[in-house]
A protein has these predicted regions:
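Short, intrinsically disordered C-terminal tails of secreted or membrane-associated proteins
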Residues: 212-216
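Interaction interfaces in information-processing and related assembly proteins
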Residues: 1-185, 201
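Short Cys/His-rich Zn2+-coordinating modules
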Residues: 207, 217
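Alpha-helix boundary/capping motif
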Residues: 187-195, 203-206
Length: 218
């Protein structure tokens, strides 16, 4: 599954004049929220929230089916500026340690479901992979990409673009038994490992990532 965001980022991110690394981190949270929310095939809200001790203390992204998206970041401006000056403003460094909560809300007459993942100096990508390892125990790859791009014919203005990719093996897929190096795989770490198969899978994922554009659909 792949999702791509464009104008919605331009509509949300400039409202609060976020520093660029904070805006990029919030864009990652937004695309991950839409990626997971649209994968669930439900009606209601999917909410992503972080609470951490890093310069970005909280992220909230709220996706309501079918197409509504809201997001907000709470941060310490001085700590963010210091992190930028020290060259330590990666997503994982801005988050620090804490928790990532993923909530499914299908309305007041339905039970809410929530999953909690520890953030220990990890990125949102890493936390999402940990979530799937804990909850579904399936080999899962999550990739997120965020960038600002100049759009031709628009007065050389920069626009935010983001993309996300979620790839999983089916539970009975034979490749699952042959790829011991994938998180959640069933193969023995030392027996029956064919490097050519693993390399082929890695090339496949790389092609998928390269094919993932960062433009808005719809």
């Amino acid at each position: 599954r792949a999702v791509q965001l464009g104008p919605v980022l331009d509509a949300i991110l400039p409202r609060h004049d976020y520093p660029e690394p904070v805006a990029a981190l919030l864009a990652e949270a937004m695309v991950l929220t839409v990626l997971l929310g649209t994968a669930l095939k439900f009606e209601g809200k999917f909410i992503l929230q972080t609470r951490t001790n890093g310069p970005v203390e909280m992220l909230v992204a709220d996706f309501a089916t079918p197409r509504s998206l809201r997001a907000y970041a709470s941060f310490d401006a001085e700590r963010v500026a210091a992190a930028e000056a020290a060259g330590r403003a990666s997503p994982a460094e801005l988050l620090g340690t804490g928790i990532l909560a993923l909530t499914v809300d299908q309305g007041r007459h339905m039970q809410r479901y929530q999953g909690i993942v520890q953030l220990d100096g990890t990125s949102l990508e890493d936390a999402a992979r940990s979530y799937f390892r804990q909850s579904e125990q399936l080999p899962t790859e999550v990739r997120l990409a965020v960038a600002r791009q100049l759009v031709p014919g628009d007065g050389a203005r920069e626009h935010w673009r983001a993309g996300g990719l979620l790839a999983q093996f089916l539970p009975e897929a034979p490749e699952r038994m042959r790829l011991p190096d994938l998180p959640g795989g069933d193969g023995d770490e030392d027996v029956g490992h064919d490097p050519s198969v693993a390399a082929g899978a890695d090339n496949h994922h790389r092609r998928r990532r390269l094919c993932l554009g960062i433009r808005h659909r719809g």
